[in-house]
A protein has these predicted regions:
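Conserved substrate/cofactor phosphate-moiety recognition/catalytic segment
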Residues: 28-71
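Hydrophobic positions on the alpha1 helix immediately C-terminal to the Walker A/P-loop
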Residues: 23
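A glycine- and Lys/Arg-enriched "phosphate-lid" helix/loop adjacent to the NTP-binding pocket
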Residues: 105, 109-170
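Conserved lysine of the Walker
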Residues: 20
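NTP-dependent small-molecule kinase module
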Residues: 2-4, 160, 166-218
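Phosphate-end processing signature that detects enzymes handling 5′-triphosphorylated RNA
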Residues: 188-189, 195-366
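Conserved nucleotide-sensing/catalytic segment adjacent to the nucleotide-binding pocket
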Residues: 53-113
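The conserved Walker
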Residues: 16
């Protein structure tokens, strides 16, 4: 039986004048050189507007947004079929914005109504993509380069661009592989950082992501719940028995009764670097793999708050047995990168290198 193609679906999103158009060209060349077949789904809103389908020409904004969401999903389905039929075994579908990018243009009630009409829940709707990369608008950190001259559809002022950037990022909050590409370097450096993050997400042999972890005083849950750029998810991680030296764990992740399932594998590359790969599981696959659970480990249950703050996506983990503390984590490709802890968190100490606070150690039965 012929082996199925390995298909990755990623989203490039961001605020106005963030550099997405140039980034698409960079990714096309770099991913092709790396041996991938690359398929680009153009921005749905622009495609519709250029075809005469606009919000202004629709009866209501909600009518237009509903059409746009349905068109986005249809194109993703068609491109997925094309990827499955590709002669290449490694295919990357790159979406110029994804389905959650429409959320800032609707009320919460309108967005919920569209999900209900489509028979979708927000967790699956958001997390169906393998990774999401948010390119920050030039209006935030590279103001001298912000312009509306290169896009007739762009009319936002600096302040409006920053506000829209924040709303777009908030719409994606909670995705397990959301990365923020800010303007901390020049534009060429921004593109290099994007490419590095994309290659890491695709599982190319690359240095293992560095997670910095901090023990913090018990934070205010109400503040997290009400933060516009924060989402709560429930997580159960189960470690499996090793296979050929590879450490494996499966994860159930979601909220409000809607869950998705993953398996993560850690191994060592030929150069000694640690490599992490991840794949989505069906519920049946997840339940079957539960039979391979390591009998020396307990499942780890935690409530996670995914908080978007400036250049980083922070994760705040609450464990049932902890009454006076929580874990704050941020993942970095560059271990030397500066991390500015949000002022609402009081750090007890950093535990990045403390083996007692690694997930595997916490799961071990003692």
């Amino acid at each position: 039986m012929e082996q199925a193609n390995h298909i990755h679906t990623i989203v490039i999103t961001g605020g106005p004048c963030a550099g997405k158009t140039t980034a698409m060209s960079w990714l096309q060349n770099a991913l092709t050189d790396a041996g991938y077949a690359v398929m680009f789904i153009p921005e749905t809103c622009t495609d519709l507007n250029n075809s005469g389908v606009t919000a202004r020409a629709s009866k209501t904004n909600f009518d237009f947004q509903r059409v746009q969401v349905k068109y986005q999903l249809l194109r993703e389905q068609v491109y997925r079929q094309a990827a499955e039929a590709s002669a290449s075994k490694e295919v990357v579908i790159v979406c110029d914005r994804g389905s959650m990018d429409d959320k800032p243009y609707m009320t919460a009630e309108e967005f919920a109504a569209i999900l209900k009409e489509l028979g979708q829940n927000e967790v699956a709707f958001r997390d169906k993509y393998d990774a999401v990369f948010h390119m920050v608008t030039a209006a935030k950190g590279a103001e001298a380069f912000y312009t509306t001259d290169n896009n007739t559809a762009r009319v936002e002022t600096l302040e409006e661009a920053i506000e829209l950037d924040a709303k777009t990022l908030a719409a994606w909050a909670g995705h397990p592989h959301l990365r923020i590409i800010d303007n901390s370097t020049d534009f060429n450096g921004k593109l290099v950082r994007l490419l590095r993050e994309v290659m890491t997400a695709l599982g190319k042999p690359a240095p293992f992501e560095h997670a910095r972890r901090f023990l913090i005083d018990m934070p205010d849950r109400a503040w997290l719940e009400n933060h516009p750029a924060c989402r709560r998810v429930e997580i159960i991680q189960t470690y499996l028995t090793d296979v050929q030296g590879e450490k494996r764990r499966i994860c159930m992740r979601g909220s409000d009764g809607s869950y998705i399932y993953y398996m993560t594998t850690h191994c060592t590359g030929t150069d000694g670097s640690r490599i992490e790969t991840e794949k989505r599981l069906s519920l049946d696959d997840y339940q079957q793999l539960m039979m391979e659970a390591d009998p020396m480990c307990m499942p780890i249950r935690k409530t996670r708050y995914c908080l978007m703050d400036d250049a980083h996506a922070f994760e705040v983990d609450f464990y049932p047995a902890w009454q006076d503390k929580a874990m704050l984590q941020v993942e970095l490709n560059d271990p030397e990168a500066d991390v500015h802890i949000p002022e609402n968190f009081r750090v007890k100490r950093e535990v990045t290198d403390d083996p007692d606070y690694q997930n595997y150690a916490m799961a071990r039965i003692r």
